[in-house]
Structure formats: structure tokens, C-alpha cells
A protein has these predicted regions:
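Conserved AAA+ P-loop NTPase core
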Residues: 162-166, 172-173, 221-252
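Conserved beta-strand position immediately N-terminal to the Walker
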Residues: 5, 193-194, 260-261
């Protein structure tokens, strides 16, 4: 009754055409990334190398990186690819393999290009809120990124109490400001979902709350645990006047009102959830 259609994998030329069509990246910016991806996939197919346990490099990830390079051609491609493959969490030997593959295709970290090609690492001063925008400047005062703040007064007046407020307890440094700059790029400009990974107590929630406070974005929060279920993600039960009632979960409210959804301890719940 039903015809069987076999979809063959894309050729290299077809995949490159899709990436450029979806991102608008130039050939100059894509060439070194494309060379690394081809080399990475070839090495990852060899079980003796050790990359088979690392993160795969799919077309969707390639499009995401290409969109970022199309918007910011001078971005640190080395750090972008290194972070995309979660190399900081890989064994040292596998991390070194990725590092040498990047060097082989001419992708080096900013600050190590050599004479006449030196690009200093981006060092940012504390972000500034001015005229309804959030602005990032480098240490010389040159503007790096400027995004409009969220107009919650007209779009979500009920979410005013959900905007984080650190009450001046957040202190900026170059590393944290650089991380917030990258989060704002992905969250506000490229409209990407984010996964923050790191050791316990490194301030992931603190940094995320500070970003949302600077952007004036209301946020919903939910914390996962090993007993979390799909039903808890959709609605919550509570007792009122002796009656059991159900209300929308923070996830549903975030979707309905267009708020940022922060899911904490996501690694604690089961894979099915």
C-alpha cells in the first residue's frame, strides 16, 4: 500500500549549499570550518582514534556555527568549534586530537596567530544599559555588541516580578563578561537555545540571572530531580480550600507568555523526561 522512499545522505556539495543557503555565510569564513568538519568526521569514524565517544558534528550544528560567523566574521572560530564539541569535558588525549586538527586546517586561537596576523583576545568591560539597549564595549571603549532590552511593560506586564534582581551583588570580571556577551549573542541575536555546563558552584545560575536582569527579560524557573515526570513539566497540582486544583507549569507559562525558561539540574532527571 505504501511506497518506500530511501533518502540517501547528502553529498558534501549538497550539504555545503544547504549551510550557505540557511546562514548566508561567505566562502572565506566557511572554508576553514568546512575543512575541519571533513577532517573531524573522517577521524571520528575510526574507533582507534577515540573521537567516536565525542560529540558528533551534524549539519544542524554546522548551520548554527555558520549563522554566527555570517553575523560576526571576526569571531574566534577556534573557541567556537572547541566549545561546540564540548572539548573542555573530553579526556585530555581526545581534546589534544581536536586541538591539532584545528591547527592543521589553520584555525588557531585569537592571540596566537603570529607576526602581522595577531588578533588580541576579546577583553570586555562591564556591560552598560543605556537608552533602552544593552551595550558591550571592549577595554578601549569600542562598541562590540548592542541589543535592545525587552519591553515587558507592553509585552508582558504581569512578568515584572519575574525579572531577576541581583541587588548589586554581581561583580563583573573579564571572563564572566565575555561569557555573558556570548550568551546574549546566542539568546537575543541568533535566537538559540542554550545549555550551560560546568562544575557545581561555578555561578551558572548567577550569570544567567544577571544576563536576564540586564536584558529586562522575565524568566520562569523549574528545577529537575530524579523523580521528575513529564506530567510535572506540563501542570502542577495544589490544594486550595480542601480541593485539588491544577495550574499551568512554569514551562507552559513561559511558552504562553514568551518568557525565558530556565531549567535547572536538567542532568538529574531521567532521559525520557
Amino acid at each position: 500500500m505504501f511506497a518506500t522512499l530511501a533518502a540517501p545522505p547528502m553529498t558534501a556539495d549538497e550539504e555545503r549549499a544547504v549551510v550557505q543557503q540557511q546562514s548566508g555565510v561567505s566562502d572565506t569564513a566557511l572554508d576553514p570550518v568546512w575543512a575541519f568538519v571533513h577532517k573531524y568526521r573522517t577521524q571520528a569514524s575510526d574507533a582507534n582514534v577515540g573521537l567516536h565517544k565525542a560529540r558528533r558534528f551534524g549539519t544542524r550544528q554546522l548551520i548554527r556555527i555558520a549563522r554566527r560567523l555570517a553575523r560576526w566574521p571576526d569571531d574566534d572560530v577556534y573557541r567556537l568549534l572547541f566549545r561546540n564539541q564540548l572539548c573542555d569535558f573530553l579526556p585530555r588525549t581526545v581534546r589534544d586530537i581536536v586541538h591539532h586538527m584545528l591547527l592543521d586546517v589553520g584555525i588557531v586561537p585569537h592571540g596566537s596567530e603570529g607576526a602581522f596576523q595577531y588578533k588580541p583576545p576579546l577583553r570586555l568591560s562591564a556591560p552598560v544599559v543605556e537608552a533602552g539597549t544593552l551595550a558591550f564595549f571592549d577595554e578601549s571603549g569600542k562598541p562590540v555588541l548592542r541589543v535592545p532590552r525587552y519591553d515587558w511593560r507592553t509585552k508582558d506586564p504581569e512578568g515584572a516580578s519575574l525579572i531577576p534582581n541581583a541587588h548589586g551583588s554581581f561583580f563583573h570580571n573579564t571572563q564572566q563578561t565575555g561569557l555573558m556577551h556570548s550568551i546574549v549573542q546566542d539568546l537575543e541575536t541568533l535566537d538559540e537555545h542554550l545549555l550551560l555546563m560546568g562544575a557545581q558552584g561555578t555561578g551558572k545560575n548567577k550569570i544567567m540571572d544577571q544576563v536576564l536582569e540586564l536584558l529586562d527579560r522575565p524568566r520562569e524557573y523549574i528545577q529537575m530531580n530524579r523523580d521528575s515526570t513529564v506530567g510535572e513539566l506540563l501542570q502542577r497540582a495544589y490544594l486550595e480550600d480542601g480541593q485539588l486544583k491544577y495550574a499551568d507549569s512554569p514551562l507552559v507559562r513561559a511558552i504562553r507568555c514568551g518568557r525565558v525558561m530556565v531549567v535547572d539540574e536538567v542532568d538529574k532527571c531521567s532521559a525520557s523526561v
